[in-house]
Amino acid sequence: MPYVYPEVDELRNKPVAGSGTCVDIIKEYVPGLKGLPTTSWKAGVNVMEAGAKVAKGTAIATFVNGRYPRINTGNHAAIVIKVMPSGIWVMDQWANDKRPTIQLRLITIPPRALQRNSDGSFRNPSNNALAFYVIEK
């Protein structure tokens, strides 16, 4: 079951949620995920494979082996605005961004040579539309 925040458009240029990490926007706004630890998150459908079936306002994230990784960099969570063949428009925030507000951003599909590492894992998953999955519990 996807978790959706229908008022996602209203988040643009609002002050960052919580401490400004990407997961804080999910934990603060998305019903059903508010306040829950990321350890409760599981990977649902791949966003790019599902395409337009992913509703506006759906919470998404990068996952490793079906779980949200607890690492300092290379993982990301956001809220979908629109899925297109070339990428995903999202509302998001991230810890090292100097802007004090939630932003609209396009996460694209990188060129084929830059999509995956030799072990099959996603290269730079935070900026690779292929690496995002719908958040489920």
Question: Residue locations for each model-derived region?
Answer:
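Secreted/periplasmic proteins that engage bacterial cell-wall peptidoglycan
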Residues: M1-A77, K82
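Aromatic- and glycine-rich peptidoglycan recognition patches
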Residues: Y5-N13, I81-K137
